Regions:
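Extracellular glycan-modifying ectodomains
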Residues: 1-156
Length: 156
């Protein structure tokens, strides 16, 4: 299957690998791995939970689940299965100027074993089913900035 009309490379993946490899010969590159997708709109789901509460008992249960980050989670194994080909492609890129950032490590298999969280006790990390909220984006940006700092530190 040919994804490139000029025939320069046989597939989109091969084209990506070759171009990133070529660019990385003289430039540092940070590869950002896939961000977990939730599969449903987190904010809408949160609102549904709140609207369906029967006070006061459900409020305590809701608050407890929210505090433990367990209210809305996704299966880490499904994330791994869905992103396997992306990981394989990015992992195939080698070179001294290639660096990696793994946003899923912020959300998956950390707070809750085998699950990817969508919130903590104070923040919601998604604005819909797969786009990070300002807080989620800041967390990912902080990971990227840490990687940039490591790269700069190595350069001195």
């Amino acid at each position: 299957q040919n994804f490139i009309s000029d025939g320069k490379y046989k597939t989109l993946q091969k084209s990506f690998i070759n171009e990133v490899s070529r660019i990385s010969e003289n430039n540092k590159i940070i590869l950002i791995y896939p961000i977990p997708e939730v599969g449903w709109n987190v904010v809408i789901q949160m609102n549904k939970f709140i609207q369906n509460l029967k006070f006061p008992n459900d409020l305590n249960e809701f608050h407890s689940a929210f505090e433990k980050s367990t209210l809305i989670t996704t299966d880490y194994k499904i994330y791994q299965e869905r992103t396997e080909s992306s990981f394989n492609l990015l992992d195939s890129l080698k070179g001294k100027n290639i660096y990696r950032v793994y946003p899923h490590k912020l959300f998956c298999d950390k707070t809750i074993k085998g699950r990817c969280i969508t919130h903590d006790s104070n923040n919601i990390f998604y604005v819909d089913d797969h786009h990070p909220s300002s807080k989620g984006a800041k967390m990912i940006n902080d990971l990227i900035m840490k990687e940039i700092e490591k790269i700069e530190h190595k350069s001195y």
